[in-house]
């Protein structure tokens, strides 16, 4: 009788350990999901602020007879423009203008990367299109 009780007790302990590990793994995955989603929403909000800062800076440059977009410069922005944007937004993200409409004087595409998040903005057919991606580094040599 003691042997049977001991076997049943061991099985119950094993089952409890397995269930505990499965529940713990579930909560780890759930925690990481919400952490990544929160970071993505934060990056998206910052990218919307980048868009507003680019528009504001372009209006200011228009008054000076210049353009915020400089295709011959790295990231499509002068160092002064990049510093101004980072000063306005108080962040350390990287902004790269990918397209610009000189007739309407608006930025029609840019990417904003902060941490492991990359936000892509494209203005097409009078609508704003946003993509938020989480970047995973697979190899570092």
Where are the model-predicted features located?
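Short amphipathic alpha-helical patches
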Residues: 16, 57, 62, 73-74
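N-terminal Lys/Arg-rich, disordered targeting/topogenic segments
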Residues: 1-9
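N-terminal polybasic/positive-inside topogenic patches
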Residues: 130-131
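Amphipathic alpha-helical segments typified by the pilin-like N-terminal helix
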Residues: 9-51
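Extracellular/periplasmic head regions of type IV pilus-like filament subunits
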Residues: 64-127, 137-141
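N-terminal alpha-helical signal peptides/signal-anchor transmembrane segments
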Residues: 46-65
């Amino acid at each position: 009788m003691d042997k049977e009780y001991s076997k049943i007790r061991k099985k119950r302990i094993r089952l409890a350990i397995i269930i505990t590990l499965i529940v713990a793994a579930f909560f780890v995955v759930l925690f990481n999901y919400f952490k990544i989603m929160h970071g993505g929403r934060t990056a998206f909000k910052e990218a919307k602020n980048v868009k507003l800062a680019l528009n504001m800076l372009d209006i200011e440059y228009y008054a000076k007879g210049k353009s915020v977009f400089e295709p011959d410069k790295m990231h499509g922005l002068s160092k002064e423009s990049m510093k101004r944007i980072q000063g306005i937004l108080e962040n350390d993200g990287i902004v790269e203008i990918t397209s610009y409409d000189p007739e309407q004087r608006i930025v029609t595409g840019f990417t904003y990367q902060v941490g492991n998040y990359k936000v892509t903005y494209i203005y097409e057919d009078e609508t704003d299109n946003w993509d938020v991606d989480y970047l995973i580094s697979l190899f570092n040599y």
